């Protein structure tokens, strides 16, 4: 159960929001604010948190926006972002490894730029390489398991969504295999120095989607790509349920207007037991008579009013 409260004009001025989360009968207060200098702060039951990992498990959320419908056809960075966001929500160990990997990759890239002026520092690359391999290998391993888990769920969901016409499979395409990681870094060293960036590692991974054996990222229609994206988000919900034994909150951000009536119906019929927050224009067109609505808020010219 979730309720959101804008606490008086003071909170609005400070760009703050207070949220109450209830899980298994235990209520937790979360305060979030954005300061004038754009820095963010979060406190749980009055205690300021120091790192994002402290939020893990507090409230599992699946966010679905129009941009997600393009995840299949867009660049690999968006597909990596989807996988990373999901795994960071479910696995604190993955979050730890990803954060450290990114920091080390940035440090290595800085060194690669410095080598232009200080070529004598070239031998220090191996220090960063060993750490990159250590943390990067754990990322690759976890991504492989994640894709296997997702494939077990997405198969049946996509078959139903496509009217039994398609079988969908996600294929993980690591930039480098773990056993070759260190050697690949050494082999790419001259190239990395020239380009001043690390060109080998899981930060260059990709994921492909195959419907009936056809790579729909390259050869699929927009309809196929959108159906696969919807299957992916619905599978994300089921995977969170399976791993955490808890139902996530679903946030639908103006995504219904981007779906045809069949996909709208499939989505709304599939979220009947999930607490959902929907933002959309034309509420009557998309939602009325399809889902049970508990609370409706209308935003007009920056003013929020409750309609029920």
Region spans (language model):
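Hydrophobic positions in the central parallel beta-sheet of the AAA+
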Residues: 64, 250-251, 278
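Walker B catalytic acidic pair
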Residues: 253-255
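Single conserved hydrophobic/aromatic residue that forms the stacking wall/gate
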Residues: 1-8, 12-13
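Hydrophobic "anchor" residues on beta-strands that sit immediately upstream
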Residues: 27, 41, 61, 249-250
